[in-house]
């Protein structure tokens, strides 16, 4: 089972090395997308079979397997875009047919070509593929304040949709460089815009883009023709303010929008940071915040540990707008919000947590912990903050101890904190 995977650009007259030309002349079966066939069709042998690469890919792989069943020594020559090992079809072949022999003949990938057109060094560029993929890796790059981000798009994650998401969460200190039909001398277009300009623009497919923070542009003296700076879209006087500050280690409580302005309805910043430490989030992958209220714990976790998947639960519907407002204010995209009674929430489609914080339980702590245990990973932990005050009728620490005993959970020694004039707080933690 042998594949030759040949990378091509959008040029209607592709150039191939003599070795590749010989493979094409001798080839018997070819494969690729419709666009690839339109480009290379004139160079293929007459009446050569062509296997279209379309979804579902399982049908494509069945045709490949059928070919090798009858012609085991006859290779399939596959055409793919750019570098087939760069988020490309050669990767897919390796995963599906690990025993296959694969030879790759790459050309420049689309982001390399765009960087070349912009005369932009790209050794420091973070690559994110949104082609058939969700937002998390892109969000992570934004939160980490990456200076240069190369993005592979699709028809859902368009330049306009990407720009709108960035504006919504306050990451508007980037310029966007969009390349369309790269490699096609008749259709190729490279455009540099502000995010605000991009939101109302449509671009032809295929396209890709490179995002560069404004201060990065200044620092690199990037003043290529057609850039945001060259067109005067950015005032040079704004050089020192057109970028986010480093995300703080601890957001001031007063900066959050609160539930009905009630300052006691938020986990205070020092307690919040100690809570995140107790959750061991650097080693975790999925964090659940049950009873998020203002969203302060979820947002702090999102900013400090952007690799996490975060699911936030709250029974009060008015808190949905509050967490959304706070998430946008602090640049924390990607928190999965669930409104309703946690005990009635269907958890089957959610990622299994390995860290859970219970910020509110409404007197149903035992039931909540029992439900959490049905999905908590084997190495997971649960953390809760307990406060004992004259006006607080429910003894959360006692409920916690009883629940841990009934559910056979191993408790860590509690951490007792007294903050300013507030009542003592205990940070409680348990594991399976």
How would you name each of these model-derived features?
Residues 379-391:
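Conserved beta-strand signature within the Rossmann-like core of class I S-adenosyl-L-methionine
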Residues 3, 81-146, 343, 400-418, ...:
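Class I SAM-dependent methyltransferase SAM-binding "motif I" and its flanking Rossmann-like core
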Residues 313-353:
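S-adenosyl-L-methionine
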Residues 2-5, 18-21, 76, 146-221, ...:
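A contiguous loop/helix-start segment that scaffolds small-molecule binding in enzyme catalytic cores
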């Amino acid at each position: 089972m042998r594949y030759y995977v040949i990378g091509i650009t959008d040029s209607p007259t592709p150039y191939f090395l003599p070795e590749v030309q010989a493979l094409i002349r001798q080839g018997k079966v070819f494969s690729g997308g419709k666009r690839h066939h339109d480009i290379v069709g004139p160079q293929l042998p007459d009446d050569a079979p062509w296997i279209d690469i379309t979804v579902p890919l399982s049908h494509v792989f069945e045709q490949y397997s059928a070919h090798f069943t009858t012609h085991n020594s006859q290779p399939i020559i596959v055409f793919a875009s750019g570098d087939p090992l760069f988020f490309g079809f050669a990767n897919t072949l390796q995963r599906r047919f690990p025993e296959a022999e694969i030879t790759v003949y790459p050309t420049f990938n689309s982001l390399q070509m765009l960087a070349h057109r912009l005369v932009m060094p790209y050794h420091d560029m973070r690559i994110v593929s949104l082609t058939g993929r969700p937002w998390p890796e892109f969000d992570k790059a934004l939160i980490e304040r990456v200076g240069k981000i190369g993005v592979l798009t699709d028809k859902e994650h368009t330049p306009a949709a990407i720009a709108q998401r960035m504006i919504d969460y306050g990451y508007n200190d980037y310029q966007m460089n969009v390349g369309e039909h790269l490699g096609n001398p008749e259709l190729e277009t490279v455009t540099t815009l502000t995010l605000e300009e991009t939101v109302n623009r449509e671009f032809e497919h295929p396209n890709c883009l490179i995002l560069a923070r404004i201060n990065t542009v200044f620092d690199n003296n990037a003043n290529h023709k057609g850039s945001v700076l060259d067109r005067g879209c950015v005032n040079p006087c704004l050089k020192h303010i057109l970028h986010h500050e480093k995300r703080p280690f601890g957001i001031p409580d007063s900066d959050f929008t609160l539930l009905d302005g009630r300052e006691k309805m938020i986990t205070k910043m020092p307690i919040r940071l100690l809570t995140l430490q107790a959750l061991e989030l650097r080693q975790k992958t999925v964090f659940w915040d049950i009873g998020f209220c203002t969203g302060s714990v979820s947002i702090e976790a999102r900013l400090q540990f952007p690799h996490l998947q975060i699911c936030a639960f709250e029974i009060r519907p008015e808190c949905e707008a509050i967490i959304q407002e706070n998430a946008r204010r602090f640049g924390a995209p990607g928190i999965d919000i669930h409104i309703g009674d946690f005990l009635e929430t269907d958890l089957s489609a959610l990622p299994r947590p390995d860290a859970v914080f219970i910020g509110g339980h409404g007197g149903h702590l035992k039931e909540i912990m029992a439900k959490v245990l049905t999905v908590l990973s084997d190495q997971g932990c649960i953390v809760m903050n307990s406060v004992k005050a004259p006006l607080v009728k429910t003894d959360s620490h006692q409920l916690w101890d009883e629940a841990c005993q009934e559910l056979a959970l191993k408790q860590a020694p509690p951490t007792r904190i007294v903050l300013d004039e507030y009542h003592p707080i205990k940070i409680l933690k348990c594991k399976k």
